[in-house]
């Protein structure tokens, strides 16, 4: 969950008491702590709902890598607005207004789903040939 660095740097390290509502940590730190708590349970299924929205892209990348390698046998359902959060998924479901508009892998959706392609371009600034 990429939490060790900032937790270790706290005055009391892993013995630090968090304030009510976690007001003594940032939004991204709260998200990483929530992910860490979920991982401690070693779940068979892990549902992450926009769980890295307050985390910088470099940390998000490290979290994705750790989830892939450390939880290889865990089914992960990731709800995200950032395409980078899901582009390596086995399957991506694109939704708009509560309706499924596309299902597939990243490369397939880039070619076949205009909505997915537009989101990708807006988030990365990279043009794509359909």
Q: PLM features: what roles do these ranges have?
A:
Residues 1-17, 58, 115-118:
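Conserved "ABC signature" C-loop
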Residues 60-72:
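Helical segment within the ABC ATPase nucleotide-binding domain
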Residues 69-80, 86:
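Conserved catalytic loops of ABC-family nucleotide-binding domains
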Residues 103-104:
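ABC ATPase "signature
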């Amino acid at each position: 969950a990429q939490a060790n660095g900032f937790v270790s740097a706290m005055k009391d390290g892993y013995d630090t008491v968090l304030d009510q509502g976690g007001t003594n940590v940032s939004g991204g730190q709260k998200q990483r702590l929530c992910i860490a708590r979920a991982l401690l349970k070693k779940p068979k299924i892990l549902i992450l709902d926009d769980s890295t929205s307050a985390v910088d892209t470099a940390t998000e990348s490290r979290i994705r890598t750790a989830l892939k390698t450390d939880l290889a046998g865990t089914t992960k359902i990731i709800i995200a607005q950032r395409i980078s959060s899901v582009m390596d998924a086995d399957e991506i479901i694109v939704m708009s207004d509560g309706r499924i508009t596309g299902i597939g892998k990243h490369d397939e959706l880039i070619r076949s789903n205009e909505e997915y392609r537009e989101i990708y371009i807006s988030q990365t600034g990279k043009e794509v040939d359909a």
